[in-house]
Structure formats: C-alpha cells, structure tokens
Amino acid sequence: MILAVDAMGGDHAPRAIVEGVVQFLAERPTEQIEIRLVGDELKLRSYDIKDPRVKIVHAASVITGEDEPVRAIRRKKDSSLVVAANLVKSNEADALISAGNTGALMTAGLFVIGRIEGIDRPALAPTFPTRNGKGVVILDVGANPDAKAEHLLDYAIMGSVYAEQVRGIKQPKVALLNIGSEAGKGNALTKETYPLLETAPIHFVGNVEAREAMSGEVDVIVTEGFAGNTLLKSTEGAASMIMGVMKEQFMSSFSSKIAALILKPKLKKMKQLLAYEEYGGAGLFGIAAPVIKAHGSSNAYAFSRALVQAEQMVEQQVVTKIIEAKKTKEI
C-alpha cells in the first residue's frame, strides 16, 4: 500500500504532517506501507526522516487557502497537492491525504483523480463525535450545496458502505437530516429523497433532527452541503463555546479550581470525546480512489489518524464496494 501525502497543506505544515507520518509508521513497524511525502524537498529533508518507507517527491509550489481552487489546480501543476493527486491518478499511490485548501482538494479529486462512474456529485463526510462515543458520519458538509434527491441517495449508499467497512458497524442506521422526525416533514428536496432512501439497499431509519444528530442513535446522516456545512460549523462553535465557558468558570475561584482538580479525569474524558483529532479527517466520497481531507489545524496526532482512515479505506476496498453497492441500487 502506498499513501500520497500533501506535506505542504495545512496550518502547521510541513512539521505536523511529517511528524504525523512518522507517528503513523512507528505504530506499524513491520507493515508494508509506503508514504510518498510530496512537497519542498529541501524543507522535508531537513527533518531527517529515518524510516526507509518514506520517499520524498519534490513539488516546487504550494496551493494556499487564498488560492481560487479551480484556477490553482490548473495553473499550479507543480504544487504538492496536484503532484500527490497525479500519483494516485497514475496508480503510483493508492490514496491521497491533505490538510490543505478544501476546495482545491475537491477539485483535484474531481479533475485529476476522477469520479466513480455513476456518482454525479462527490460528498465531504467527516465523523462527528456522539454522546455514546461511537461517532456519526455526516455527508455532505460542503462539497455540493445544491444537491438533488438522486445525489442524497448516492450519499446514503456511500456513507453506509463507509460506516460498515471502515467504522466496523454492522447494518449502520442511516437517517435523513430534517426539521422533524415524521415522514412528511421538510422541503421539496427531503420529501423527494425520503421514498428513495426507503427502497435503497441500506438500513434507513427515517428522519433525524439536528438536535439529535450527536445522540448516537444513528450511524450515518444524509443531507445537502449547505445544511451539512451549517451543522458542522455550528457544532464546532458550540463545542468550543462550552469548553471555553467551563474553563473560565473552573478558573474563576479557589474552590472552583479544587472542583476542577477533582473532576480532572472526567473533564479529560469529555475533552477527548469532543476532540476532532480522534476521528481522523473527512472522506471525499465519490472519487475513484480514497481521498481524505485532514483538518486544516491538524497536529501530528490528528494527521496520523487521517492516515489511519486512508489506510482502512484502502484495506477494506471501500471504493470498490461503493461501486458494487451503486450497481445494486440500479438493478
């Protein structure tokens, strides 16, 4: 297995990326996994990586967060992201992982690697934390804000395959994000999508409201990119606010500091439950090879989890199984 890594994408690149790669490989010292670390060769060699499974591939430029995605992919052919994507396209690597520009990664996936035949629109699918610790896959969170019912059906199938094959959930429960739990609720899109999901080769359990998204009652939630991105950003904001308020209150007096000390193990567990680092990155489903978008602010540990996610997608042949499930839907 060979993983192509964009070493220059992300807020803390290339250090966090390199350290994440080293950590990932150290956890599997005997496995035949190779990393193609793509980026500025001079900078990458300065980290003196000892593991022979890491091969540096030089790329002269970087696509930044300020670059317009389509223009950047077309003009910066020598960028770390485009070079890494071309390794996957030419079958020199099995998966692509980047913490860089999300729009550019989606564009590279679509126009360099290519789509799965029959999947019209890809979906960005992170795993959200849940109260029971299982996590829930939500797609789409921004790749396609103007989806049709047929696209949501594809998302449901892809999310179900991923939840079963990578997250190890037998017969994952799939729900449709809506403003109410009743079948007749919602707008024209959700009303058109609901009967399609009922007859799909998945375990569809009906609608779910946003307030129940992180309850752990369902394993996959399907929505269009606008609502999904709004849910993602509001959830991140709420979690940050809650943790911030708790920290302020616990540090506000001597007695509250004592209480914090007593509760430290529980608070640590709560922080771990809400931490994005534990869930890897967001899969870009619908692309002809595994593509993982690591969080832009990923530290070494978070990036190593994104590599684990890519490894599992390759091992479990998720793309092949999505293609098979898509054919089942069409029969």
Curated annotation (Swiss-Prot):
The keyword 4Fe-4S does not apply. It is found in: Cytoplasm. InterPro entries: FA_synthesis (IPR003664), Phospholipid_synth_PlsX-like (IPR012281). Pfam families: FA_synthesis (PF02504). GO terms for biological process: fatty acid biosynthetic process; phospholipid biosynthetic process. Keywords: Cytoplasm, Lipid biosynthesis, Lipid metabolism, Phospholipid biosynthesis, Phospholipid metabolism, Transferase. It catalyses: a fatty acyl-[ACP] + phosphate = an acyl phosphate + holo-[ACP]. Its EC number is 2.3.1.274. It is an enzyme of class 2 (transferase). GO terms for cellular component: cytoplasm. Pathway: Lipid metabolism; phospholipid metabolism. GO terms for molecular function: phosphate:acyl-[acyl carrier protein] acyltransferase activity. Catalyzes the reversible formation of acyl-phosphate (acyl-PO(4)) from acyl-[acyl-carrier-protein] (acyl-ACP). This enzyme utilizes acyl-ACP as fatty acyl donor, but not acyl-CoA. Homodimer. Probably interacts with PlsY. Belongs to the PlsX family. This is Phosphate acyltransferase.
